[in-house]
Amino acid sequence: MGDDTLDRDARIKLSIGTKKQGAYDGVFNGPSSLAFDIHRGLLLVVDCYNHRVQVFSCDDGSFVSKFGEKGHEPGEFQYPEGIAIDHDHDRILITECENHRVQSWSLSEQSFVSCIGHQGSGDLEFNNPRDVAIDKHHHRIIIADARNNRLVFLSSIDISFLFSIGKQGSQPAEFNSQSHVAIDDDRHRIIVSDDNNHRVQVLSSIDGSFLFEFGSKGDEQGQLNSPSGLCIDNQGRIIVTDFWNHRLQAFTHEGHHISSFDCGIEYPWVVAFDEHRGLIAFTTDNRVHVIGANQWLADTFTWRPDRHRYAPSWMKRTVSTMTMIRSLIDECSAMSMIPNELLFEIFSFL
């Protein structure tokens, strides 16, 4: 199970791996991407510098299997980076940075099927593809083609090229080494971590058009310093790994900051969400940690008199709830007894 030293302070349910890198089963050398197989209760971890994928049980973190080895031939990996599971087509998709291609593996058999792409900037060419995501509603595969500073859209039916968007820059729908991509299926959106622009961009998954962005460089709540991984939870909240600020941050689907998780973690790189179990997995220090999403977001949300007043807009669901909040704040203010951190124990009522 590895080093569980964070459990006491961070409510981490389980940890996989050790701080020391290695090549044994259950040990990593640069875990670079995560994907939950929600139907089988498995967590797939891309073990980048070991050029393989390891598979673990979501129940206890025990090692289940592995596949892949270093090389340039089909079915071999050269610094794999991103991973996505396409349940509709029994498919695992994996991007390779140094082979500049995308591999397709059977999900049920964990066996190689095919690969596409080579280095370049053409329709089916890539330059350091970092991540991959599945847009199940529009039957598309979306590749974060990092050094080409673009998103490439493929058909998930036959993995054919559809179109691409983006170029290098800092304007809307421009990128500077985008790291990872996630899909908000309910709102038909693509969420992209724009690493060197220190922001997250939100695009339409229908045509790739720009919708809005959030984040700016800094270490205040809601600011980012090289955002890398991201995922969407079952309430539409956007979870971002804030690499140089050594924390995870949660935002509403509108991009408003909710909460931060920074209890002793260092250099978090990627994050994934298990919608069936309500779990968030993230990587740091050659380990994979798993926490409860709802517990983190409820337990760490605080109202701070020295910052923004009241609760974020997503909490304002009923008139009675807001009346209760305002009444509580007004009463405490009148008595001059507002504590530094007033915990809102009202999540069970929302």
Which residue ranges define each predicted feature?
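Blade-level signature of beta-propeller repeat domains, shared across WD40, Kelch, NHL, RCC1
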Residues: 267-300
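Gly/Pro-rich loop segments of beta-rich domains
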Residues: 2-32, 61-81, 112-130, 161-179, ...
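Short loop/turn segments that connect beta-strands within beta-propeller blades
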Residues: 58-60, 106-110, 155-158, 205-207, ...
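Short loop/turn segments immediately following the C-termini of beta-strands
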Residues: 48, 97, 146, 195, ...
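Residue-level detector of Asp-centered blade-edge/turn motifs that repeat once per structural unit
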Residues: 36-40, 85-89, 134-138, 183-187, ...
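Cullin-RING E3 adaptor/co-adaptor recruitment helices
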Residues: 295-350
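Conserved beta-propeller blade signature
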Residues: 43-44, 91-93, 140-142, 190-191, ...
